[in-house]
Design a protein with these regions (language model features):
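Extended ligand-binding clefts on enzyme/binding-domain cores
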Residues: 14, 179, 185-223
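Acidic, glycine-rich segments characteristic of secretory precursors and extracytoplasmic regions
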Residues: 1-25
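Conserved, well-structured interaction surfaces
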Residues: 6, 10, 41-111, 151-157
Length: 223
């Protein structure tokens, strides 16, 4: 189960997702932070706000994020059958649930209305025809999912695994999208007041990793 959970973390870090292209295209190029001077049209489309559903970066990100959802669903569905303590199984399921919630949140805030898939795939075409859910419905769904497993998450002891503080930070962000300012402040304050996190120096922020200011980072290895 832990190996499968590591697979969900791996999918989050995919090149088409948090590993690079999703944020190159979805955030930076579509804003005025950077501009594109190369020859690849799928980057240029974002820089000029002329992208379509056929854009390669968009399709890569779509598949990569739903691959993360699928892997998390596999963990959630199969973990109850493993030979381990209930505490360990519940924590694994909780981590996978938060990972799935982040992926569904990213899909909704990027594309708007999306199909919400919360079951592992067992047959080809199983989810053909699944209706889209409105973005606000998706946001509330993932909030409910996170809160349902919150108490099974561990406390903050490292910066590369999902824990209660990671869930707090994600909840704060989702509540911002719902314009629920009170709950956004509530969960953000929980992170701010956690002594495990504090501001770091500008040099560490730029050149370092896993600094005291980092709530959650995806781990990479050269192996």
């Amino acid at each position: 189960a832990k190996a499968a959970l590591n697979g969900a973390y791996h999918d989050l870090a995919a090149n088409a997702y948090y590993g690079g292209k999703y944020f190159d295209a979805g955030i930076n190029l579509a804003s005025d932070n950077v501009t594109w001077t190369g020859s690849l049209n799928y980057y240029y489309d974002f820089d000029t706000h002329q992208y379509s559903a056929e854009n390669q970066l968009l399709s890569y990100a779509w598949y990569a994020i739903y691959a993360t959802v699928e892997q998390a669903n596999e963990v959630i569905s199969k973990t109850p059958t493993i030979d381990s303590s209930d505490e360990e199984k519940n924590e694994i399921i909780a981590e996978a649930t938060v990972i799935r919630s982040l992926a569904l949140f990213d899909l909704a805030r990027t594309w708007g209305n999306i199909p919400v898939i919360k079951e592992a795939t067992s047959t080809p075409g199983q989810f053909n025809g699944v209706k889209q859910s409105e973005a606000k419905v998706v946001y509330q769904t993932v909030i409910d999912d996170i809160l349902a497993v919150y108490n099974n998450l561990g406390k903050a002891t490292d910066r590369v695994h999902v824990n209660q503080s990671v869930a707090d930070a994600l909840l704060a962000r989702i509540y911002l999208y719902l314009e629920d300012w009170d709950n956004a402040e509530k969960y953000a304050t929980k992170v701010i007041e956690n002594p495990y996190y504090e501001l770091t120096t500008i040099d560490n922020l730029i050149d370092g990793s896993l600094t005291t200011e980092s709530i959650w980072e995806l781990a990479y290895s050269s192996k």
